[in-house]
Amino acid sequence: MSSLAAAHATNAVNALLQSVLPGSASVNAERKKTSRDKGSKAQLIDRNLKKRVEVQEKDVYRIKKREKKMLRKKISGRKEVQEDIEQKAKLQVLRKHQVDNSLTDHEKSYLDKVVKKNVRNLKSWDYDDKEELLDLQKQILANSEDSKKVRKVKSRRQKKKQFKEKLPQSIQDHRYKALTPGLAPVGASDEEESEDEDEDY
């Protein structure tokens, strides 16, 4: 069957499905069967093995990269140690020459460079220490100011609480038992008071 005939047949089937069952999914002629896409079991196993090999190769690459990095660190550490030993040996020779007063001009200039470098390093450390001290001082001052405020509030609350506890119970309850909120004695009404006043006149 040609592709043109297959397309016409597919369109006819889709039109029929739409008229009989509106909203149904249309048929796609170009869609391959899922079994063809997946392939046989041997092909699946082959694909999985290839993926596994790729992953292992990536892991091997990462491991080699990590090992190279560690090797570079070791080599650089050894170089630093070697340079440090050479530097100390040079300085010992220069000290001997300095004690013997047999320093050459080249050795004097080298010593001057070393001294200047060490002085710069010390000054930078002093500067860093000063900055750290200033930061620490600011932090301590900020904390102490905050703590002062908190202490003031707590002391005020504590004083109020102690003052209220020291007062006798009769003073604390400042309301009078015989009077109502309108200041009339309990149980008395306005009519009784007015009768009492009339009798007095």
UniProtKB/Swiss-Prot annotation:
Protein's cellular compartments: Nucleus, Nucleolus
InterPro entries xrefs: Rrt14 (IPR031404)
Pfam family, one: RRT14
Biased composition (Acidic residues): 189-201
Tree of life domain: Eukaryota
Disulfide topology: none
Ranges of biased composition (kind: Basic residues): 149-163
GO CC entries: nucleolus
Key words, A-Z: Nucleus, Transcription, Transcription regulation
Annotated region described as Disordered, given as residue ranges: 24-43, 147-201
Annotated Basic and acidic residues bias: 29-40, 164-176
Primary location group: nucleus
Spans through the membrane: none
Summary of the function given for this chain in its UniProt record: Involved in ribosome biogenesis, probably through modulation of rDNA transcription.
Similarity comment: Belongs to the RRT14 family.
Protein name: Regulator of rDNA transcription 14
Organism: Kluyveromyces lactis (strain ATCC 8585 / CBS 2359 / DSM 70799 / NBRC 1267 / NRRL Y-1140 / WM37)
